[in-house]
């Protein structure tokens, strides 16, 4: 994919208060080459003026940046939002990382400020503190003359209002009671977006909100989205998420998140994860492995602040593109989005040139957010500071701390800039005055070429609930046109007003425009799912769309009939996939029936009711935080550009996870540094002690019983006890230190390989002369089968090893045998495990091991023995014992 582009340097020439551009190459700030870094310390990095900083930035020809708001009017800006009159609200995290230890970060001294352009010249000349004394504000959503604000460490959302027009909020009302929020501030919700479907989305939440007819918050559970910092939607209402921790960038973008997390083959084109910065300051938490020899970042590590550009005052080539920031790389990525055969593909617009849309040599350029503005341009939020990572990643002894201190990055705080991206061929658009307009005028704005105007008009119409505009909306919602976007906004506005008819949905499903048919399906599945009436015609139309010629529509029909809860949905979807040659249709079908949330039916027996509740809560936390490094499958997220390497260790079969729970609790509370099982992953496992005891217990319970793992649930009280015992600890653990406290961690968890030398015995008669040795042949189709088990409870199996060995785990695979009713049989509900040195005198190790078709139990502590006895101690409805494969784990001698 080739895009010819000329680059310009932005120079500090002020004309009418604007920064204009001049053709040149970017100015290089002083930096220390990699080969001489050890010889002499680099010079301290110092702040530049906004104009001088802009001069270090590189953009494609014709584009330029102009500062619209800077220090001292703002400090530490992290996000912006505009109300219906174009007033800009800025969330300022004024206590964020004021030194390398995050001293005072949790003090409520942050704010949301409001800024107005009173004369329409594009310069913000009126500044007020709208809401003060906040704890690191991270959520803003303007409504009408009100705005929702959310702070750190809570999921509560408040509505603020300025009733007297002085620019300072004097009313504060709780709108949504979410309760306290644990976790590091980098792992908390952000980016409240009112999407086209009238759902209000944020990162991390496994639910969406919406305004009810009475103005109260309504909550609906949806899949975890995997987003981290920043949120945006495209012209069709799909919400886009970006994650920093998994070093991938955009995640779960194939379909709207309400239908699940989906991926597709080759969805990222070429070397999409590779980045091409100009800055040579290697301050990445991943260490030298994240850098090229010249100390430039080599791939994503801090992606955030995304926007689908939907404005009308920049070149058409930019519209519909996904842009997001990489503040560690001091750059902004421009992503081209294409859809082929039902699969969405992403590509770096400048991959052929090994370049980026915007990049700077100024090391303090820290873009963290961007947004399509009311004037049709793009606004970029630059936190402009030294340290960008939170304190958990900058602890003493870390590689990142060394870089911070070497470059004196901790000194540069308290600034911030907001830039407007302009192009030489376009003027700014007019300032809106929607809050002073009528609902009828808002309906007209649904046809505006700037997506910000359309979104704002829809939101105001739904909030006002003035039904006098319904006829105008129905007319717009029924009309086919070259641009389907106004029609879709009209349909969803009617939905938000509870005034949408089945007739209009059916008309949308018959549209010649594929995008309209897709939205018709979404409207239909929401209507049918509500089960307010039979909606027979809608159901029939949804079934019909499974045969649509456009694979995008076919996929949406598959998702919609499933979400609508049609009784024969699975049969219809699988038949559709079987008849289709579309890659996208095939990929979606495969994932629809293989979701991570499909729960093992044995968990209720293994964990009990309370343990299962903990497991489910932990699954949500894992899916929103832990997956980024450890992967959705628990085997470690692949590291970009490093074949076979992962960002973090595998959790599947991990001795820390499956052994003494004190070890894994210690790690999540205070982190882990250094090599793990002989592999150096570069970055440490950071402390998670800002999460509550219950949250940590839940996520550990989930991990210990997922990815092939089996271990008892972790109790919150156990986490609390370990937290209290290590209360004075401030540094990371190392495995050596943990092993000195818990020697069992030093016992290998290797698969025993001398099975051919094992001697087996059992006191049960074999069925069909099946040999005991069949459980050791590595063939899951063969095994040892007993006759009906009698008498009870004296059934046992013994194993004599070639030599005395240390045993940490046992694996009994009984899968594959089913009763006439289709129930899995051949396994015992409870076992006991005993050991002996002579095969005569036995010592109990675990008297109550819960069984299952594939029983994987880990002993409470490593044991050393030559003889092992596994006995059945409880009897259920099964009649015989089946062992297809038997394996032991530990240190075999």
Feature-to-residue mapping (PLM):
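Short beta-strand-plus-loop segments that form exposed binding edges in beta-rich domains
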Residues: 871-878
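Structural detector for internal amphipathic alpha-helices that build alpha-solenoid repeat scaffolds
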Residues: 429-432, 452-465, 485-499, 504-510, ...
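Gly/Gly-Pro-rich "capping" loops immediately C-terminal to redox-active cysteine motifs
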Residues: 406, 634-693
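Beta-propeller domains with acidic blade repeats across secreted/periplasmic ectodomains
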Residues: 25-441, 452, 460-462, 533, ...
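The canonical Cys-X-X-Cys-His
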Residues: 370, 381, 418, 618-633, ...
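Electrostatic cytochrome c docking/interface patches
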Residues: 599-623, 635-640
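Disordered, acidic Ser/Thr/Pro-rich linker "stalks" and the adjacent N-terminal cap
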Residues: 46, 51, 746-804, 815-827, ...
């Amino acid at each position: 994919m080739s895009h010819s582009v000329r680059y310009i340097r932005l120079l500090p020439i002020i004309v009418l208060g604007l920064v204009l551009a001049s053709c040149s190459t970017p100015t290089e700030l002083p930096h220390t080459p990699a080969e001489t870094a050890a010889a002499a310390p680099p010079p301290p990095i110092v702040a530049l003026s906004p104009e001088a900083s802009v001069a270090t930035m590189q953009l494609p020809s014709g584009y330029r940046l102009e500062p619209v708001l800077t220090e001292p009017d703002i400090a530490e800006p992290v996000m912006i939002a505009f109300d219906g009159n174009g007033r800009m609200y800025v969330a300022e995290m004024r206590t964020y990382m004021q030194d390398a230890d995050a001293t005072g970060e949790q003090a409520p001294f942050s704010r949301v400020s409001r800024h107005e352009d009173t004369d329409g010249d594009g310069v913000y000349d009126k500044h007020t503190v709208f809401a003060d004394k906040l704890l690191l504000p991270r959520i803003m959503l303007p409504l009408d003359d009100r705005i929702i604000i959310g702070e750190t460490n809570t999921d509560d959302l408040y509505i603020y209002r300025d009733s007297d027009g002085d620019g300072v909020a004097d009313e504060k009302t709780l709108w949504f009671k979410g309760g306290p929020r644990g976790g590091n501030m980098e792992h908390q919700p952000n980016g409240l977006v009112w999407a086209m479907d009238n759902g209000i989305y944020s990162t991390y939440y496994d639910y969406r909100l919406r305004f009810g007819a009475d103005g109260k918050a309504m909550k609906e559970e949806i899949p975890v989205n995997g987003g981290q910092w920043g949120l945006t939607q495209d012209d069709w209402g799909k919400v886009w998420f970006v994650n920093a921790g998994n070093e991938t960038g955009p995640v779960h973008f194939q379909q709207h998140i309400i239908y699940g997390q989906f991926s597709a083959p080759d969805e990222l084109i070429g070397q999409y994860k590779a980045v091409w910065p100009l800055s040579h300051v290697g301050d990445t938490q991943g260490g030298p492995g994240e850098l090229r020899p010249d100390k430039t970042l080599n791939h994503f590590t801090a992606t955030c602040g995304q926007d689908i550009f939907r404005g009308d005052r920049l070149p058409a080539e930019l519209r519909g593109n996904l842009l997001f920031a990489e503040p560690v790389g001091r750059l902004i990525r421009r992503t081209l989005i294409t859809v082929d055969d039902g699969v969405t593909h992403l590509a770096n617009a400048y991959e052929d040139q090994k370049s980026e849309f915007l990049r700077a040599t100024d090391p303090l350029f820290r873009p963290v957010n961007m947004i399509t503005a009311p004037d049709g341009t793009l606004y970029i939020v630059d936190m402009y500071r030294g340290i960008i990572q939170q304190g958990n990643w900058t602890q003493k002894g870390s590689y990142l701390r060394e870089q911070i201190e070497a470059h004196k990055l901790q000194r540069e705080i308290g600034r911030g800039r907001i830039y407007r991206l302009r192009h030489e061929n376009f003027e700014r658009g007019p300032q809106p005055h929607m809050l002073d307009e009528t609902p009828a005028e808002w309906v007209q704005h649904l046809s505006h070429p700037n997506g910000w105007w359309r979104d704002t008009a829809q939101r105001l119409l739904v909030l006002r609930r003035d039904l006098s505009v319904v006829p105008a909306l129905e007319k717009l919602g029924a009309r086919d046109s070259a641009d389907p976007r106004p029609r879709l906004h009209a349909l969803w506005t009617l939905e938000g007003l509870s005034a949408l008819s089945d007739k209009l949905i059916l008309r949308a499903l018959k549209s010649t425009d594929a995008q309209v048919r897709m939205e018709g399906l979404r409207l239909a599945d929401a209507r049918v799912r509500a089960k307010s009436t039979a909606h027979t015609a809608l159901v029939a139309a949804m079934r019909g769309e499974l045969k649509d010629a456009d694979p995008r529509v076919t996929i949406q029909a598959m998702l919609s009939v499933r979400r609508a809860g049609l009784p024969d949905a699975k049969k219809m979807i699988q038949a559709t996939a079987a008849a289709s040659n579309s890659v996208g249709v095939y990929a979606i079908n495969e994932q629809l029936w293989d979701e991570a949330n499909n729960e093992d039916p044995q968990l209720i027996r293994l964990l009990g009711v309370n343990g299962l509740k903990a497991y489910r809560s932990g699954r949500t936390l894992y899916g929103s935080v832990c997956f980024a490094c450890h992967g959705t499958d628990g085997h470690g997220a692949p590291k970009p550009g490093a074949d076979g390497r992962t960002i973090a260790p595998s959790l599947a079969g991990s001795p820390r996870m499956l052994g003494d729970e004190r070890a894994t609790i210690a790690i999540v509370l205070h982190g882990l540094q250094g090599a793990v099982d002989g592999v150096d992953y570069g970055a440490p496992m950071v402390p998670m002690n800002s999460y509550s005891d219950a949250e940590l217990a839940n996520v550990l319970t989930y991990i210990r019983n997922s990815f092939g793992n089996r271990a008892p649930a972790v109790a919150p009280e156990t986490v609390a006890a370990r937290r209290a015992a290590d209360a004075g600890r401030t540094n990371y653990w190392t495995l050596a230190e943990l092993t000195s406290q818990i020697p069992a961690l030093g016992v290998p968890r290797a698969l025993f390989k001398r099975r051919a030398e094992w001697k087996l015995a059992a006191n049960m008669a074999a069925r069909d002369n099946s040999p005991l040795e069949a459980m050791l042949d590595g063939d899951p189709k063969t095994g040892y089968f007993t006759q009906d088990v009698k008498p009870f409870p004296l059934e046992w199996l013994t194993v004599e090893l070639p030599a005395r060995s240390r045993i940490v785990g046992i694996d009994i695979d009984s899968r594959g045998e089913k009763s006439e009713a289709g129930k899995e049989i051949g396994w015992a509900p409870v076992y006991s495990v005993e050991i002996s040195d002579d095969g005569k005198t036995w010592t109990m190790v675990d008297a109550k091991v819960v069984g299952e078709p594939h029983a994987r139990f880990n002993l409470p502590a490593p044991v050393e023995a030559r003889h092992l006895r596994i006995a059945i101690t409880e009897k259920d409805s099964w009649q015989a014992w089946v062992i297809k494969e038997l394996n032991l784990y530990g240190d075999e001698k």
